[in-house]
Amino acid sequence: MKYRDLRDFISQLEQLGELKRITVPVDPKLEMTEICDRTLRAGGPALLFENPVGFGTPVLGNLFGTERRVALGMGRDSVAELRELGELLAFLKEPEPPKGFRDAWEKLPVFRKVLSMSPKVSSSGPCQEKVLEGDEVDLYKLPIQTCWPDDAGPLVTWPLVITRGPNKERQNLGIYRQQLIGRNKLIMRWLSHRGGALDFQEWQQQHPGEPFPVSVALGADPATILGAVTPVPDTLSEYAFAGLLRGSKTELVKCIGNDLQVPASAEFVLEGFLYPGDMADEGPFGDHTGYYNEVERFPVFTVERITHRRNPIYHSTYTGRPPDEPAVLGVAMNEIFVPILKKQFPEIVDFYLPPEGCSYRMAVVTMKKQYPGHAKRVMMGVWSFLRQFMYTKFVIVCDDDVNARDWKDVIWAMTTRMDPARDTVMIENTPIDYLDFASPVAGLGSKMGMDATNKWAGETTREWGRAIAMDPAVKTRVDEMWSSLGIDTPE
């Protein structure tokens, strides 16, 4: 599905029956979370709350609440088509030299398409139709959700944060939640290894004492939002990747108060600075783990200007115990991750992030085992190859006769092919999500790899069991006679 911006995407979702307009007044404080949570768990539509209590701006929720809508947001009609997108990213991440003239000719359209999707910079855009500065800046006028009863306050949950480090041409795009603490102040919660935080650190080193410019787009088009959470090769900008998804160049506009470029069609843009030493306690907030997180200090984002479209729409979400939108995104992203992993490890058959595992904390891998110890190599590869899996605590590796997406299969393999002492790998003092309160130290914890593959000579001295399977000829005969047996079985 191709679309121009968030509004066009909303319109097309409505035509497909994938969006519901809610005209009943609903409070952004808690009520929207409960409604979106029930809707997501039922596989329901995106929701456009047209009458948020106390506000005149509609709120869009549950946009990526199903795998299909994630695929539609990426310009595809089904989740299965995301596998092709992963193959493209795998190729761009590590392009192979052409094997000859014919191969070079066949690859030329791919490179031409990528080069043709460089973003287009315009002199003006819809996101700057209205400009608020000085005392007009009041974030309390936005219908920012308070998601859970013990949250510290309203939380901006889908901010596309745009930064640029010193001496860098490429901008960084990231999704970092922001707590509202004043009419023009938000807390920028980013982890130290994230692109935005690294840009800020480099800025402080090269420009000590100077404020760091930041812009935040709210309500960007889905391709740009999803591009910010996809493993895009370092040689490809998120804006160019968004153009590939959307099928048209990403249109950007320069901010009024800094040199950063933001999506021209965004509903809102916040422009401002991080001032050195200006920090605040963030949290607690209910998170994707299903728990409230600890209070930690993060930089304060001072908003000096708000620009927005006429009659803007505020895009929001909540995070909570899975399933939530991050968990749904994780499942859909599986299809993108598989080809990228297979490019480096061709023996991998499938890769799965169970939604119950809080988006990324557990991974199941199936593989064609080729030698003793092979499963352990794949474990290490998952942890090290893509930074998206830096925080994955548990990796289960199974043979290719196991369905990675079926817990019954996985548990069977674990309980019949594993010895806990021999087949468990424990690694201490590794990077862990700061939100993981189970780790002994914030940001530092252990990882566990589980080898649930059949064991080869060298891994065991015992005779290994052979899996039971019925004779195919017998199965065929029983299939043919089944209807005459009169045995009623549930569908």
Swiss-Prot record:
It catalyses: a 4-hydroxy-3-(all-trans-polyprenyl)benzoate + H(+) = a 2-(all-trans-polyprenyl)phenol + CO2. Binds 1 prenylated FMN per subunit. Keywords: Cell membrane, Decarboxylase, Flavoprotein, FMN, Lyase, Manganese, Membrane, Metal-binding, Ubiquinone biosynthesis. Pathway: Cofactor biosynthesis; ubiquinone biosynthesis. InterPro entries: UbiD, UbiD-like_C, UbiD-like_N, UbiD_bacteria, UbiD_Rift_dom. Mn(2+) binds at N172, E238. Pfam families: UbiD, UbiD_C, UbiD_N. It is a peripheral membrane protein. One of its GO terms (molecular function) is metal ion binding. SUPFAM superfamilies: FMN-binding split barrel, UbiD C-terminal domain-like. The keyword tRNA-binding does not apply. It comes from the Bacteria. One of its GO terms (biological process) is ubiquinone biosynthetic process. GO terms for cellular component: cytosol; plasma membrane. It is found in: Cell membrane. Its cofactor is prenylated FMN; Mn(2+). Homohexamer. Belongs to the UbiD family. Catalyzes the decarboxylation of 3-octaprenyl-4-hydroxy benzoate to 2-octaprenylphenol, an intermediate step in ubiquinone biosynthesis. This is 3-octaprenyl-4-hydroxybenzoate carboxy-lyase. It comes from Alcanivorax borkumensis (strain ATCC 700651 / DSM 11573 / NCIMB 13689 / SK2). The gene is ubiD.
